[in-house]
Each structure stands twice: as C-alpha cells, then as structure tokens.
C-alpha cells in the first residue's frame, strides 16, 4: 500500500536514488547514454544540495514498505518541477496521484495554470493528465543538449 506525505529532512538520499534510477532505467528508451549521464549523474550528486529546492516548494513523496518510491514538487508559481517514480513502481498510478494532489494544492493557493518541462518519456503521461504542448524545448546540462517539451494545463 502506498502512503503519501510531504518531504522530510532525511529523505534526500532516497529521493536522489529514485531520480537516478528513474532517469537511467526508464528514460533510456528515449535518450542516449550521454544525455542520461548529464541529466542524472550516477555519482557526485550531493543529495542535501540537490533536494534543497524541494523544501521551498510543495513536495510530496510516495512511500511503500517504508521506502520512498516516488516524489513530485511544484513551485508556488505553478511550475511542476520534478515528477519521478522508481522503475519498480511505474504504472501503478503513483505519478498521477502525486500530480493530482499538487494541482489541487496549487488551485487552493490561487494558481490557475500549471506548466511543466516534460521529458520525451513523460510526454504521453502529461497529455493523459490534460496538459497541452506549448513548445519544444532544449536544456543544456554539462554541455549536453537535452530535448523536452514545455506543456501547460489550466486548472
């Protein structure tokens, strides 16, 4: 059974592990190895520093059997920044639930439009959640260009 809660100090290492596993095991079908390595380096990430912005945002985690298996965060302005689910827990509705709860929180705080930079891997997921393509986008990480899609949803 999945339990839902806000991020807590001490979650950082588990959150970074979910991020890295999700990128390298799930997104590899849509991105080459050099882009995956730039997006989610498998070594050298400081979990506390990487997670620091999550404590400024509305951040939820999904917990199963005492382990974090997913997380998502949204800024106060309505930018859905990170949505990641462990490869072992994909397809169970975890991301849908996390996004839905964050959308409700945003609406309750007066946000009427949510934006997200969706990876190629997550594009179909966000379309199914009612997000619409705004434009194709390129980000650069460590000199490597990585494609994604800016999407938006009116709530």
Where are these regions (language model features)?
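Conserved G/P- and acidic residue-centered "switch" motifs that form tight phosphate/ATP-binding loops
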Residues: 93-95
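Conserved GNAT acetyl-CoA-binding A-motif
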Residues: 106-119
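Acetyl-CoA-dependent GNAT
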Residues: 6-9, 17-90, 99-101, 105, ...
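Extreme N-terminal starter segment of soluble prokaryotic enzymes
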Residues: 1-3
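Conserved catalytic-core motifs of GNAT/GCN5-like acyltransferases
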Residues: 115-117, 132-150
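Conserved active-site tyrosine of GNAT-family acetyltransferases
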Residues: 126-127, 131
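Exposed loop/turn and edge beta-strand positions of beta-sandwich/beta-sheet ligand-binding modules
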Residues: 56, 79, 112, 145-147
